């Protein structure tokens, strides 16, 4: 059978072939829509700007009763194992088979639940203004968009229906590559982002956080080439599993900033789609009133492909009245932009008409009823599900697929019409990030108990044993070798990216997120976040990591072995003796073994004495020192030479960029870890074999980076250099794999030491008590 032959899509029965009760359930599933409708007396009007942000929030009993009754039912889920509950609700989800069917049958790009949800919205409401079709140009802005499924869905809709307009888009999300961003706040999937980076705006600080006024100003400049924005979407949220009952309040500031951004950027007559959750709180009531006053039509819609048991809804706003109509109010709203806006209510309670509150309550009751019924039914079926119920669910799921395809008339789209026709990146971080959040496999109650434990209790109970004890010796030359060939580095296309100084390194595209998170917790809880090794650790010499340390002899032996391998594959043997440049390792210079290398030392005592902290290799002082040593080293090297270079870690884009440069000018790079028994100091070295020369333009570019680093440090600037090699380059497969291996070895070695130290202190403490 030919590998190119496509798997046939399963032919499904038409909806008419299902029983009336199945059809009735599916009709209801696709009919969760509430339209506000405005009173004829036109009493829904915005208040005078002088009245906004003057009063405290006033919660209303009718809405609080709805919130409390919903949370009572949600609390019944607290003792359920999340993996078991998710597996159960995946089966009871009537729309659960739609996504995979759509992906196969119409060749949908980035076909996720969000893709299908947005397609339902596109096909249910006239989101795209007629003006866009008349002028032949559509501009859209997508806020909090990761991973990009709304964009992919819109592309499919436009291309498959052959709408006569040229489409331009700009997107924003929390930058998955920014080291100070918390992965709990992000969707760690960069399949689309990595291949379309030029269309993503991460703001002046490069974080992607929309909740700052500087971001809003920068975004307006970024989209200034668009004559008008016809459509804005905002799909923002973050992980609320630590406090699911307060999801609405936790995301209220984000919703406010999304709304203000949309009202500031959207053109007259445009459309806005906003993801919200429950709308019981006063802050949500205010936002809904604002939107009803700013748009001709407001609908609240729950797509069939949105899981029926959650609170998610989409507010669909049509025919924007324009910035001019609300200019005085909008100007004042931007002054309260940010995370602290919820301290005062947007509107005083008395300015919101009773007719709006009544209509809004009807909306909340409408969706509250459906959610309550779904959760209660899922609990009942979780405890006992018979064969008849399983068969009915299977029929419902099959009927939902057919109804979806028939109702929305989805069409096949060839890959030539995708946003990313062929990925230019061999391996984005997406494949590595999936499946790493093992906290999902605990019940809510278990997670809360774990959060309540002190750091020492967690160590004593062995919660981190797997990270510490799986840390074995990394043998260089066996698996982690980065092979390079002389290549033309297009550094004229690169640019230096500055941003706000990193307070700490919370995430990295070059490391397993769980390992980094655990290491940071260990440093923060055990060592106070940052420390001085001279004062804190030298008096406690009994604390040393028990794992094997590579001796100087083994390091040189490995280096010689790699050098010989390289010489064996070379046609022309270098006429001069190969030089080995040691950076910062004065002890290696006096090694008593015969090696066929001319050993030279580039002294840099500071480079090896940097210690592990919450900043890791994000410290600008360390980065400047490392780059300075690298530039001095490159001046000393000739073709075929080798180098031993100590490295603290490579979590940041800056350090990954330097490893990429090394990768391009050496035939082989591998690493050795650990090389030191000193606690939490630099414990890894790079073995760089077969120097191939660095082009002068690249060397000069690195010099300019170094000069900027020095300028920023000497002026005590709040900025630092975040990146100087494009992410598209850093995400290439071989380099990414190497960095993951290197960082895992370093992080686990530090974890091993910290946890071993804590265990010894716990044991000593218990012995003293006895």
UniProtKB/Swiss-Prot annotation:
Predominant localisation class: nucleus
GO cellular component assignments: cytoplasm; nucleus
Keywords: Cytoplasm, Methyltransferase, mRNA capping, mRNA processing, Nucleus, S-adenosyl-L-methionine, Transferase
Adrift-type SAM-dependent 2'-O-MTase domain mapped to chain residues: 109-322
Recorded GO MF terms: mRNA (nucleoside-2'-O-)-methyltransferase activity
Catalytic-site annotation from UniProt: 117, 235, 275 (proton acceptor)
Class of enzymatic activity (EC top level): transferase
One Pfam family this sequence matches: FtsJ
Effect recorded for residue 235 to A: Abolishes catalytic activity
Signal peptide annotation: none
Effect annotated for changing residue 74 to A: Strongly reduces mRNA cap binding and catalytic activity of the enzyme
Binding-site residues, S-adenosyl-L-methionine: 148, 167, 235
Phenotypic consequence of residue 117 to A: Abolishes catalytic activity
InterPro entries: Adrift-typ_MeTrfase (IPR025807), mRNA_Cap_2O-Ribose_MeTrfase (IPR050851), RNA_MeTrfase_FtsJ_dom (IPR002877), SAM-dependent_MTases_sf (IPR029063)
Reactions that this protein is recorded to catalyse: a 5'-end (N(7)-methyl 5'-triphosphoguanosine)-(2'-O-methyl-ribonucleoside)-(ribonucleotide) in mRNA + S-adenosyl-L-methionine = a 5'-end (N(7)-methyl 5'-triphosphoguanosine)-(2'-O-methyl-ribonucleoside)-(2'-O-methyl-ribonucleotide) in mRNA + S-adenosyl-L-homocysteine + H(+)
Subcellular location: Nucleus; Cytoplasm
EC number: 2.1.1.296
GO biological process per UniProt: 7-methylguanosine mRNA capping; methylation
UniProt entry tagged with the keyword Transferase: yes
Name of the protein: Cap-specific mRNA (nucleoside-2'-O-)-methyltransferase 2
Organism from which the protein derives: Homo sapiens
